[in-house]
Amino acid sequence: MKIGLCAYSGYKIYPGHGKTMVKVDGKNFTFLNSKCEAAHLMRRNPRKVTWTVLYRRKFKKGQEEEQAKKRTRRTQKYQRAIVGASLSDIMAKRNMKPEVRKAQREQAIKQAKEQKKSTKASKKTTAPPTKGKAAPKAKAAKVSQKAAPRVGGKR
């Protein structure tokens, strides 16, 4: 027993029912009843007609019991070592008291400043003395074009 589908509504057509329309270009349309055929001939969009299968699919009608809601995977946190720091070092820094951390930071900043100062001083001593300021180059004056005269009076 062959069960067909309606070209307009999408409902099943059982043997002995329905009507087949063949167009001049050779396209076959099988309709469940005259209601479907008339709607097709009036060029009604089956996605906008509420009782068709296409409409029900478009607006997700009657699918709640069939499909369970998809479960999303929760992200999990892992603690692992980074290149240049072992996990124990990271945990020790994390568990450090804020006062100790602040003192360490200030000490590191002080050290960096001293190092910068020493490198700057060494550069100063090795740099050759300059013979005074070089004369600045004279810039060429820009030639500005005069605006074209306005024509046509007030706008």
UniProtKB/Swiss-Prot annotation:
BP-aspect Gene Ontology terms: cytoplasmic translation
Region of interest: Disordered: 92-155
GO molecular function, one term: mRNA binding
InterPro entries: L24e/L24_sf, Ribosomal_eL24, Ribosomal_eL24-rel_N, TRASH_dom
Keyword set, alphabetical order: Ribonucleoprotein, Ribosomal protein
Annotated family: Belongs to the eukaryotic ribosomal protein eL24 family.
Protein name (database record): Large ribosomal subunit protein eL24
UniProt lineage: Eukaryota, Metazoa, Ecdysozoa, Arthropoda, Hexapoda
Gene name of this polypeptide: RpL24
